[in-house]
Amino acid sequence: SDGYRYHDVFHFANAAILHWSPTFRSLLKRKRKSSPEIDEKEDGGRAVVVEEGLTAWIFNEAKDMDMFAGYNNVPMRILKNIRTFVRGYEVQACPMKLWEESILQGYSVFRAIYQNGGGSVVGDRNKRMIWVE
C-alpha cells in the first residue's frame, strides 16, 4: 500500500496554508451556502474534483521523489502545472510559494502519519502551518 488512504492530510494542508480546500470544507460541512454562486463555483462538486484530481496527480509525482523527503523546494514544473490546473478558482490568487509550503508541509505530515499508522494532525491557519502531535 502506498498510504493514499491518508491523503486527506493534503486537503488539511491546503485549508491551513492556502486557506482553500473545497474537499475539507465539504467534510466539515462548512460550505458557503449564503452565496449560491460561491457555493456552486468554489465549494461545489467541480471544485472538489479539481482538488481531488490535483491531489492525486501530485501524489503520483511525489512517488518518484521519495514523497518529497529531503526536499526544500517543489519542482517548478509541478508548481506551474498547479497554477494552470486551478485557473478560474479563488485559489489561483495564491502565490506558488504558498503552494510549495502546502505540499512540503503536507508531505512531511503524510510521511509521519504513514510511518506511524496514524496520528493527530494540528493546523494553524494564522501561521499557515500543520504538524503531527
Which stretches of residues belong to each language-model region?
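Metalloprotease/metallohydrolase-associated module, dominated by Zn2+-dependent proteases
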Residues: 1-6, 10, 17, 22-133
